[in-house]
């Protein structure tokens, strides 16, 4: 992995793999945390492994364009964390990781460590045989995982969904499943269209490894997967992207452009780093 190239493309606005650098990655020395916060005076990692503020870990500047990083040894998968950010005015913010790969279940809002290198895909045959489908018909079944079927008061897990959905799809002649947004979101009533975590699979239905298994089972049955994405606006919740480092960063700097009709914040698509953030999310 060429870190210098990833950073260069991220700042230029055309990165498709920013997630290889940013976020929390398990490496030989521990877990490497990297975050973009150009307006911050200081950034710390805090979490279950620091007893939160008691043993906060100060991050280092990777460059003069606002990238901060630190590698922390001896961390376990599923530990929770946030970034503690000191703004230019001296205020303190606690933010979830914009590049978090997993998160706590609402109403909790911390990010969670997950080792994506442990994912084991078994769909090589599907990938090798798939085409652009220009030469054959597609029949797409769209669903909201949280509402398709319920297990008492709870939605189906990915395993339960695979058990019942795959036979239903095959019996009714569908070729693809389109899943409404699976990125993390705080408000159930939004059906996933008001996103807080653009790299974080929502914890409502299971963890990334269980979703890995769901996709493998669908592909093994000859069923394609399409995932809806919301690259226009994001939630205003304090733990999220809004005024991430104390100033407008992911949103437009003026209030008229920043606020959407949905009670959310519009992404500032003029910002090169925001474009890289969204394009990398789509590629992820």
Residue locations for each model-derived region?
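The feature marks proteins involved in alpha-glucan
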Residues: 1-32, 62-142, 147-155, 160
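Glycine-rich, histidine-containing beta strand-loop boundary motifs that form or position
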Residues: 35, 47, 72, 85, ...
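Short proline/glycine-enriched turn/loop motifs at strand-loop junctions of beta-rich domains
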Residues: 36-43
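Short beta-strand elements bearing conserved aromatic residues within extracellular beta-rich modules
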Residues: 43-45, 81
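Short, surface-exposed loop motifs enriched in S/T, G, D/E and P with embedded aromatic residues
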Residues: 55-63
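Substrate-binding/active-site clefts of carbohydrate-active enzymes
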Residues: 126-137, 144-284
């Amino acid at each position: 992995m060429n870190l210098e190239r990833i950073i260069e493309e991220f700042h230029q606005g055309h990165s498709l793999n920013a997630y290889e650098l940013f976020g929390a990655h398990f490496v030989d020395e521990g877990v490497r945390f990297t975050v973009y916060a150009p307006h911050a005076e200081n950034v710390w990692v805090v979490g279950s492994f620091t007893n939160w503020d008691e043993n906060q870990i100060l991050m280092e500047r990777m460059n003069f364009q606002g990238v901060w990083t630190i590698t922390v040894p001896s961390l376990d998968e599923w530990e929770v964390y946030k970034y503690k950010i000191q703004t230019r005015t001296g205020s303190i913010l606690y933010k979830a990781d914009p590049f978090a790969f997993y998160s706590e279940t609402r109403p909790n809002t911390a990010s969670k460590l997950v080792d994506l290198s442990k994912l084991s895909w078994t769909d090589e045959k599907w990938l090798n045989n798939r085409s652009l489908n220009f030469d054959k018909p597609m029949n797409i079944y769209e669903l909201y995982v949280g509402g398709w079927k319920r297990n008492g008061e709870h939605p189906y897990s990915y395993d339960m969904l695979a058990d019942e959905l795959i036979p239903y799809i095959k019996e009714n002649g569908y070729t693809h499943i389109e899943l409404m947004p699976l990125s993390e979101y705080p408000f159930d009533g939004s059906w996933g269209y008001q996103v807080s975590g653009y790299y974080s699979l929502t914890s409502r239905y299971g963890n990334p490894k269980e979703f890995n298994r769901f996709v493998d089972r669908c592909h093994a049955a000859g069923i394609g997967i399409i995932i809806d994405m919301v690259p226009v606006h994001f939630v205003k919740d304090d733990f999220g992207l809004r005024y991430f480092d104390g100033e407008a960063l992911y949103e437009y700097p003026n209030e008229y452009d920043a606020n959407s009709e949905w009670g959310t914040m519009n992404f500032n698509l003029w910002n090169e780093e925001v474009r890289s953030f969204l394009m990398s999310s789509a590629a992820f």
